[in-house]
C-alpha cells in the first residue's frame, strides 16, 4: 500500500500498519476516502467488522485521521480523547464546524 501520491493511509500521523488494517477491513484504503466521514460511524463499522467493541482509543486515531484528510493540522491521538469521551457519553459534537471544544483548554 505504498504510494507516492499521498494516498497511503500510513502517511497520516498516528496511522501505522495496524491502524491501516482496521481501515482496510471496512474498505477504506486511501486518505481521500476519509474526507467528510463521521469518525464515530467508521469506528462502529470497524468494531462490527471485528465482531467486538474495539479499544476506544482507536476512535481518537480515527478522528485524527479524518481531520488530517480534511486538511486540518496533524495532532497526537490523545488530543481527541476528551472529545471522544464526550461523544461516547452522548454529548455530541460538530464535525462540520471543527472538533467540539477546539481551542479550549
From Swiss-Prot:
Keywords: Antibiotic resistance
Cleaved signal peptide residues: none
Coiled coil: none
Pfam families: Cdd1
Keyword Methyltransferase in annotation: no
GO biological process: response to antibiotic
InterPro entries the UniProt entry points to: Cdd1
Free-text function comment from the UniProt entry: Involved in mitomycin resistance. May operate with McrA or may be a type of transcriptional activator protein.
Protein name: Mitomycin resistance protein McrB
Organism field: Streptomyces lavendulae
Gene behind the chain: mcrB
Amino acid at each position: 500500500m505504498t504510494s507516492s501520491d499521498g494516498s497511503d493511509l500510513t502517511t497520516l500521523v498516528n496511522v501505522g500498519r495496524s491502524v491501516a488494517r482496521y481501515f482496510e477491513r471496512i474498505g477504506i484504503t486511501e486518505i481521500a476516502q476519509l474526507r467528510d466521514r463521521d469518525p464515530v460511524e467508521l469506528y462502529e463499522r470497524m468494531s462490527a467488522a471485528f465482531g467486538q467493541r474495539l479499544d476506544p482509543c482507536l476512535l481518537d486515531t480515527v478522528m485524527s485521521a479524518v481531520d488530517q484528510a480534511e486538511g486540518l493540522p496533524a495532532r497526537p491521538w490523545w488530543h481527541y480523547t476528551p472529545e471522544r469521551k464526550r461523544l461516547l457519553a452522548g454529548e455530541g459534537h460538530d464535525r462540520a464546524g471543527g472538533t467540539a471544544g477546539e481551542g479550549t483548554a
